[in-house]
Protein backbone atom coordinates (compact mmCIF):
# COMPACT_ATOMS: atom_id res chain seq x y z
CA UNK A 1 0.00 0.00 0.00
CA UNK A 2 1.26 3.42 -0.88
CA UNK A 3 2.24 5.89 1.85
CA UNK A 4 -0.45 8.42 0.79
CA UNK A 5 -3.19 5.82 1.05
CA UNK A 6 -1.93 4.82 4.48
CA UNK A 7 -2.16 8.44 5.71
CA UNK A 8 -5.72 8.71 4.39
CA UNK A 9 -6.84 5.54 6.12
CA UNK A 10 -5.19 6.58 9.36
CA UNK A 11 -7.08 9.94 9.37
CA UNK A 12 -10.40 8.23 8.72
CA UNK A 13 -9.74 5.81 11.58
CA UNK A 14 -8.97 8.66 13.98
CA UNK A 15 -12.17 10.51 13.05
CA UNK A 16 -14.24 7.34 13.49
CA UNK A 17 -12.74 6.70 16.92
CA UNK A 18 -13.41 10.28 18.01
CA UNK A 19 -17.03 10.16 16.90
CA UNK A 20 -17.54 6.88 18.75
CA UNK A 21 -16.28 8.51 21.97
CA UNK A 22 -18.38 11.78 22.08
CA UNK A 23 -17.32 12.54 25.63
CA UNK A 24 -13.88 13.48 24.33
CA UNK A 25 -15.25 15.89 21.67
CA UNK A 26 -15.66 19.03 23.88
CA UNK A 27 -12.26 18.52 25.36
CA UNK A 28 -10.80 18.05 21.90
CA UNK A 29 -12.47 21.20 20.56
CA UNK A 30 -11.58 23.21 23.66
CA UNK A 31 -7.98 22.07 23.44
CA UNK A 32 -7.90 22.92 19.77
CA UNK A 33 -9.38 26.40 20.39
CA UNK A 34 -6.92 26.98 23.19
CA UNK A 35 -4.07 26.06 20.94
CA UNK A 36 -5.39 28.33 18.22
CA UNK A 37 -5.97 31.24 20.62
CA UNK A 38 -2.35 31.12 21.69
CA UNK A 39 -1.38 31.96 18.16
CA UNK A 40 -3.44 35.24 18.16
CA UNK A 41 -1.68 38.56 18.49
CA UNK A 42 -2.03 40.87 21.53
CA UNK A 43 -5.46 42.65 21.56
CA UNK A 44 -5.82 46.31 22.75
CA UNK A 45 -9.11 45.52 24.48
CA UNK A 46 -7.18 43.65 27.16
CA UNK A 47 -6.03 47.01 28.52
CA UNK A 48 -9.60 48.33 29.04
CA UNK A 49 -10.73 48.65 32.66
CA UNK A 50 -13.36 45.92 32.50
CA UNK A 51 -14.46 46.43 36.10
CA UNK A 52 -15.44 50.04 35.32
CA UNK A 53 -17.82 49.03 32.52
CA UNK A 54 -18.94 45.74 34.05
CA UNK A 55 -22.40 47.14 34.87
CA UNK A 56 -22.91 48.46 31.35
CA UNK A 57 -21.85 45.17 29.76
CA UNK A 58 -24.12 43.20 32.08
CA UNK A 59 -27.06 45.50 31.25
CA UNK A 60 -26.60 45.12 27.51
CA UNK A 61 -26.03 41.35 27.53
CA UNK A 62 -28.60 40.42 30.19
CA UNK A 63 -31.63 40.89 27.94
CA UNK A 64 -32.37 39.55 24.50
CA UNK A 65 -34.73 42.47 23.72
CA UNK A 66 -33.63 46.00 22.79
CA UNK A 67 -32.66 48.03 25.89
CA UNK A 68 -33.70 51.33 24.21
CA UNK A 69 -36.85 51.90 26.26
CA UNK A 70 -37.84 55.44 27.40
CA UNK A 71 -36.79 54.72 30.98
CA UNK A 72 -33.49 53.29 29.81
CA UNK A 73 -32.84 56.33 27.61
CA UNK A 74 -33.43 58.67 30.53
CA UNK A 75 -31.04 56.62 32.68
CA UNK A 76 -28.36 56.70 30.00
CA UNK A 77 -28.77 60.47 29.51
CA UNK A 78 -28.50 60.97 33.24
CA UNK A 79 -25.33 58.84 33.34
CA UNK A 80 -23.71 60.61 30.37
CA UNK A 81 -24.82 64.23 30.81
CA UNK A 82 -25.88 64.51 34.44
CA UNK A 83 -29.16 65.63 35.90
CA UNK A 84 -31.51 67.77 33.84
CA UNK A 85 -31.57 71.45 34.82
CA UNK A 86 -35.07 72.76 34.20
CA UNK A 87 -35.22 76.18 32.59
CA UNK A 88 -37.65 78.87 33.67
CA UNK A 89 -41.02 78.62 32.03
CA UNK A 90 -42.41 81.45 29.93
CA UNK A 91 -44.88 82.32 32.67
CA UNK A 92 -42.09 83.09 35.13
CA UNK A 93 -41.51 86.78 34.40
CA UNK A 94 -38.88 88.78 36.26
CA UNK A 95 -40.03 91.11 38.96
CA UNK A 96 -40.56 94.67 37.72
CA UNK A 97 -37.83 97.13 38.54
CA UNK A 98 -38.50 99.95 40.92
CA UNK A 99 -37.27 103.49 40.17
CA UNK A 100 -34.38 104.59 42.36
CA UNK A 101 -35.78 108.11 42.63
CA UNK A 102 -39.50 107.54 43.01
CA UNK A 103 -41.68 110.63 42.82
CA UNK A 104 -45.46 110.38 43.28
CA UNK A 105 -47.70 110.95 40.30
CA UNK A 106 -49.88 113.35 42.26
CA UNK A 107 -48.50 116.35 44.12
CA UNK A 108 -49.43 116.21 47.82
CA UNK A 109 -48.24 119.80 48.32
CA UNK A 110 -50.41 121.27 45.59
CA UNK A 111 -53.72 122.86 46.47
CA UNK A 112 -56.19 122.00 43.72
CA UNK A 113 -59.39 123.88 43.12
CA UNK A 114 -62.64 122.04 42.46
CA UNK A 115 -63.32 121.53 38.76
CA UNK A 116 -66.30 123.87 38.77
CA UNK A 117 -64.02 126.69 40.00
CA UNK A 118 -61.25 126.17 37.45
CA UNK A 119 -63.11 127.36 34.39
CA UNK A 120 -61.39 129.94 32.23
CA UNK A 121 -62.61 132.29 29.54
CA UNK A 122 -60.23 130.41 27.26
CA UNK A 123 -58.30 127.18 27.94
CA UNK A 124 -54.70 127.51 29.03
CA UNK A 125 -52.23 127.57 26.17
CA UNK A 126 -48.66 128.05 27.38
CA UNK A 127 -46.11 128.08 24.59
CA UNK A 128 -43.26 125.59 24.70
CA UNK A 129 -40.59 127.94 23.24
CA UNK A 130 -41.02 130.27 26.20
CA UNK A 131 -40.29 127.37 28.55
CA UNK A 132 -37.20 126.41 26.55
CA UNK A 133 -35.97 129.98 26.73
CA UNK A 134 -36.52 130.00 30.49
CA UNK A 135 -34.52 126.81 30.96
CA UNK A 136 -31.82 127.79 28.43
CA UNK A 137 -32.60 124.66 26.49
CA UNK A 138 -31.14 122.35 29.16
CA UNK A 139 -34.38 120.58 30.11
CA UNK A 140 -35.24 117.62 27.85
CA UNK A 141 -38.67 117.00 26.40
CA UNK A 142 -40.76 113.89 26.97
CA UNK A 143 -40.51 113.00 23.28
CA UNK A 144 -36.72 113.22 23.31
CA UNK A 145 -36.40 111.08 26.43
CA UNK A 146 -38.60 108.33 24.98
CA UNK A 147 -36.78 108.37 21.65
CA UNK A 148 -33.33 108.03 23.21
CA UNK A 149 -34.40 105.22 25.55
CA UNK A 150 -36.47 103.25 23.06
CA UNK A 151 -36.26 99.47 23.69
CA UNK A 152 -34.07 97.58 21.22
CA UNK A 153 -36.93 95.44 19.93
CA UNK A 154 -39.11 98.46 19.26
CA UNK A 155 -36.21 100.29 17.58
CA UNK A 156 -35.54 97.22 15.41
CA UNK A 157 -39.10 97.06 14.09
CA UNK A 158 -39.15 100.81 13.50
CA UNK A 159 -35.92 100.67 11.53
CA UNK A 160 -37.12 97.67 9.54
CA UNK A 161 -40.32 99.54 8.63
CA UNK A 162 -38.26 102.56 7.59
CA UNK A 163 -35.97 100.50 5.36
CA UNK A 164 -38.94 98.75 3.76
CA UNK A 165 -40.58 102.09 2.98
CA UNK A 166 -37.33 103.44 1.52
CA UNK A 167 -37.08 100.39 -0.75
CA UNK A 168 -40.61 101.04 -2.01
CA UNK A 169 -40.53 104.85 -2.24
CA UNK A 170 -36.84 105.74 -2.39
CA UNK A 171 -35.07 108.22 -0.11
CA UNK A 172 -36.83 111.27 -1.53
CA UNK A 173 -40.20 109.55 -1.69
CA UNK A 174 -39.92 108.48 1.95
CA UNK A 175 -39.02 112.03 2.99
CA UNK A 176 -42.09 113.35 1.16
CA UNK A 177 -44.23 110.64 2.75
CA UNK A 178 -43.17 111.50 6.31
CA UNK A 179 -43.58 115.23 5.60
CA UNK A 180 -47.13 114.59 4.37
CA UNK A 181 -47.95 112.61 7.52
CA UNK A 182 -46.62 115.41 9.71
CA UNK A 183 -48.63 118.00 7.77
CA UNK A 184 -51.83 115.95 8.04
CA UNK A 185 -51.32 115.48 11.77
CA UNK A 186 -50.73 119.19 12.26
CA UNK A 187 -53.88 120.11 10.30
CA UNK A 188 -55.85 117.54 12.28
CA UNK A 189 -54.74 119.05 15.60
CA UNK A 190 -55.48 122.59 14.44
CA UNK A 191 -59.01 121.76 13.38
CA UNK A 192 -59.61 119.75 16.54
CA UNK A 193 -58.62 122.82 18.51
CA UNK A 194 -61.16 124.88 16.60
CA UNK A 195 -63.87 122.31 17.18
CA UNK A 196 -63.15 122.09 20.88
CA UNK A 197 -63.21 125.85 21.21
CA UNK A 198 -66.41 125.94 19.17
CA UNK A 199 -64.99 128.74 16.99
CA UNK A 200 -66.80 129.07 13.67
CA UNK A 201 -67.98 125.48 14.03
CA UNK A 202 -69.78 124.36 10.87
CA UNK A 203 -68.80 127.48 8.94
CA UNK A 204 -65.10 127.00 8.57
CA UNK A 205 -63.95 125.07 5.53
CA UNK A 206 -62.25 121.86 6.58
CA UNK A 207 -58.67 121.48 5.34
CA UNK A 208 -58.28 118.83 2.67
CA UNK A 209 -56.82 115.61 4.00
CA UNK A 210 -58.14 116.03 7.54
CA UNK A 211 -61.85 115.38 6.99
CA UNK A 212 -61.41 111.62 7.39
CA UNK A 213 -59.64 112.04 10.72
CA UNK A 214 -62.31 114.43 11.96
CA UNK A 215 -65.09 112.04 10.99
CA UNK A 216 -63.21 109.31 12.82
CA UNK A 217 -63.34 111.15 16.18
CA UNK A 218 -66.87 112.55 16.06
CA UNK A 219 -68.23 109.92 18.45
CA UNK A 220 -65.43 110.78 20.92
CA UNK A 221 -66.02 114.53 20.84
CA UNK A 222 -69.58 114.08 22.08
CA UNK A 223 -68.17 112.72 25.37
CA UNK A 224 -65.71 115.59 25.92
CA UNK A 225 -66.61 118.74 27.87
CA UNK A 226 -64.90 121.30 30.07
CA UNK A 227 -61.67 121.86 28.16
CA UNK A 228 -58.95 123.14 30.53
CA UNK A 229 -55.96 123.43 28.19
CA UNK A 230 -55.06 123.01 24.51
CA UNK A 231 -51.57 122.55 23.04
CA UNK A 232 -50.10 123.78 26.30
CA UNK A 233 -46.59 123.28 27.65
CA UNK A 234 -45.98 121.58 31.00
CA UNK A 235 -42.89 121.48 33.21
CA UNK A 236 -42.21 119.01 36.01
CA UNK A 237 -40.59 121.20 38.64
CA UNK A 238 -38.89 118.32 40.50
CA UNK A 239 -37.91 115.88 37.75
CA UNK A 240 -37.07 118.67 35.28
CA UNK A 241 -38.58 117.69 31.95
CA UNK A 242 -40.92 119.45 29.51
CA UNK A 243 -43.87 118.40 27.41
CA UNK A 244 -46.57 119.73 25.13
CA UNK A 245 -50.01 118.42 26.06
CA UNK A 246 -52.64 118.13 23.32
CA UNK A 247 -55.65 118.58 25.55
CA UNK A 248 -56.89 118.45 29.13
CA UNK A 249 -60.65 118.01 29.40
CA UNK A 250 -63.37 115.96 31.00
CA UNK A 251 -64.08 112.66 29.27
CA UNK A 252 -67.16 110.94 30.64
CA UNK A 253 -66.91 112.96 33.85
CA UNK A 254 -63.21 112.16 34.35
CA UNK A 255 -60.58 114.88 33.97
CA UNK A 256 -58.04 113.45 31.53
CA UNK A 257 -54.90 114.27 29.65
CA UNK A 258 -55.99 113.55 26.07
CA UNK A 259 -53.53 112.67 23.32
CA UNK A 260 -54.78 112.67 19.72
CA UNK A 261 -53.01 110.24 17.38
CA UNK A 262 -53.39 109.44 13.67
CA UNK A 263 -52.71 106.03 12.20
CA UNK A 264 -53.00 104.21 8.89
CA UNK A 265 -53.37 100.87 10.66
CA UNK A 266 -55.96 99.87 13.28
CA UNK A 267 -54.78 100.05 16.88
CA UNK A 268 -57.56 98.42 18.90
CA UNK A 269 -55.36 97.63 21.92
CA UNK A 270 -53.37 99.94 24.13
CA UNK A 271 -50.23 97.88 23.51
CA UNK A 272 -50.48 98.88 19.85
CA UNK A 273 -49.74 102.48 20.84
CA UNK A 274 -46.18 101.62 21.99
CA UNK A 275 -44.84 104.45 24.22
CA UNK A 276 -47.96 106.65 24.14
CA UNK A 277 -49.16 105.48 27.60
CA UNK A 278 -45.78 106.48 29.07
CA UNK A 279 -46.14 109.85 27.37
CA UNK A 280 -49.59 110.32 28.93
CA UNK A 281 -48.27 109.42 32.39
CA UNK A 282 -45.35 111.83 31.99
CA UNK A 283 -47.72 114.67 31.07
CA UNK A 284 -50.01 113.92 34.01
CA UNK A 285 -47.09 114.02 36.43
CA UNK A 286 -45.83 117.27 34.92
CA UNK A 287 -49.24 118.98 35.19
CA UNK A 288 -49.55 117.92 38.81
CA UNK A 289 -46.13 119.44 39.58
CA UNK A 290 -46.57 122.63 37.52
CA UNK A 291 -47.82 125.69 39.39
CA UNK A 292 -49.32 127.16 36.22
CA UNK A 293 -52.13 124.62 36.54
CA UNK A 294 -54.40 124.95 39.57
CA UNK A 295 -55.77 121.44 39.18
CA UNK A 296 -54.48 117.86 39.19
CA UNK A 297 -55.14 115.03 36.78
CA UNK A 298 -55.13 111.30 37.45
CA UNK A 299 -56.57 109.80 34.24
CA UNK A 300 -55.58 109.70 30.58
CA UNK A 301 -57.08 109.05 27.17
CA UNK A 302 -55.42 108.03 23.90
CA UNK A 303 -57.54 108.58 20.79
CA UNK A 304 -56.36 106.95 17.55
CA UNK A 305 -58.02 108.52 14.48
CA UNK A 306 -58.08 106.97 10.99
CA UNK A 307 -57.85 108.72 7.65
CA UNK A 308 -60.61 106.62 6.08
CA UNK A 309 -63.08 107.95 8.65
CA UNK A 310 -63.61 104.65 10.47
CA UNK A 311 -64.44 105.11 14.19
CA UNK A 312 -61.40 106.03 16.25
CA UNK A 313 -60.16 103.67 18.93
CA UNK A 314 -60.11 105.10 22.45
CA UNK A 315 -57.85 103.81 25.21
CA UNK A 316 -58.87 105.11 28.62
CA UNK A 317 -56.28 105.01 31.40
CA UNK A 318 -57.67 105.02 34.93
CA UNK A 319 -55.64 105.98 37.99
CA UNK A 320 -54.16 102.51 38.54
CA UNK A 321 -53.09 102.18 34.91
CA UNK A 322 -51.59 105.66 34.98
CA UNK A 323 -49.55 104.71 38.06
CA UNK A 324 -48.35 101.57 36.29
CA UNK A 325 -47.05 103.55 33.32
CA UNK A 326 -45.76 106.31 35.59
CA UNK A 327 -43.31 103.84 37.14
CA UNK A 328 -42.21 102.77 33.67
CA UNK A 329 -41.72 106.41 32.72
CA UNK A 330 -39.55 107.04 35.79
CA UNK A 331 -37.32 104.12 34.77
CA UNK A 332 -36.95 105.52 31.25
CA UNK A 333 -36.14 108.95 32.68
CA UNK A 334 -33.43 107.45 34.90
CA UNK A 335 -32.02 105.57 31.91
CA UNK A 336 -31.89 108.80 29.90
CA UNK A 337 -30.05 110.65 32.67
CA UNK A 338 -27.58 107.79 33.07
CA UNK A 339 -26.80 107.74 29.34
CA UNK A 340 -26.38 111.50 29.35
CA UNK A 341 -23.92 111.35 32.26
CA UNK A 342 -21.87 108.62 30.56
CA UNK A 343 -21.77 110.63 27.34
CA UNK A 344 -20.59 113.74 29.18
CA UNK A 345 -17.79 111.78 30.87
CA UNK A 346 -16.51 110.58 27.49
CA UNK A 347 -16.30 114.11 26.12
Curated annotation (Swiss-Prot):
For whether the record's keyword set contains Nuclease, the answer is yes
Give the GO molecular function terms. Answer: single-stranded DNA exodeoxyribonuclease activity
Range of residues in the leader sequence: none
Q: Name one GO cellular component term.
A: mitochondrion
Gene Ontology BP terms = mitochondrial DNA repair
Q: Which EC number(s) does UniProt give?
A: 3.1.-.-
**Record localization:** Mitochondrion
**What is the enzyme's main class?**
hydrolase
Active-site residues, as the UniProt record annotates them? 246, 259, 261
Q: Which UniProt keywords apply?
A: DNA damage, DNA repair, Exonuclease, Hydrolase, Mitochondrion, Nuclease
Is Transferase among this UniProt entry's keywords?
Answer: no
Q: Which family does it belong to?
A: Belongs to the MGME1 family.
Further details from the record:
This protein may be expected to contain an N-terminal transit peptide but none has been predicted.
> What is this protein's function per UniProt?
Single-stranded DNA (ssDNA) metal-dependent exonuclease involved in mitochondrial genome maintenance. Has preference for 5'-3' exonuclease activity. Necessary for maintenance of proper 7S DNA levels. Probably involved in mitochondrial DNA (mtDNA) repair. Specifically binds 5-hydroxymethylcytosine (5hmC)-containing DNA in stem cells.
- What is this protein identified as? Mitochondrial genome maintenance exonuclease 1
Amino acid sequence: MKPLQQIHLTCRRIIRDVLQHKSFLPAFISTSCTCLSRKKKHNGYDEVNQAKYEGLVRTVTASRISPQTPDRLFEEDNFLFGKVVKSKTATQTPEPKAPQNWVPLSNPNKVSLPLEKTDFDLPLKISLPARNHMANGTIPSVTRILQQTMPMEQAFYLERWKQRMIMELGEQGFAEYTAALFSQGKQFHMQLEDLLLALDHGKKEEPEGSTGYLSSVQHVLTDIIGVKSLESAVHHSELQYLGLVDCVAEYRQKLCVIDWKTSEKPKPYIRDTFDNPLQIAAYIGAINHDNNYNFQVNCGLIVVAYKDGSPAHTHFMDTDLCLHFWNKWLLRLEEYKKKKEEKEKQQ
